[in-house]
Amino acid sequence: MGDIIKIKENREFQRIYRKGRYAVSRALAMYMLPNYSQVNRIGITASKKYGKSVKRNRIKRLIKENYRAIQDNLKIGYDFVIVARKTDGSVEPDFNTIHKELNYLAKKLNILVR
């Protein structure tokens, strides 16, 4: 279990959005694109539509921790962008909900090893 390598540049996000595959769940969207290296990289976003900065940063922290928990079960050599989606209810997704949705998206994109 290594460190998380982040995607930081806007052009890399745009390349993954344009050329990558994606899957959507209720609270998250995951985009993926092969990077042909021996590591996975991740970018996490939450638009201003999601809420104020406190709310956006909290959901990004939850996504990051859940990704850290499942990263050993993912195939190697991909760039991922995970987008927090605004839910229709007033209830914010909790740790377990995000964990279930990340696993669902990984299965849908066929990137789970186990």
Which residues are covered by each model-predicted region?
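Positively charged, solvent-exposed patches that mediate nucleic-acid binding
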Residues: 1-114
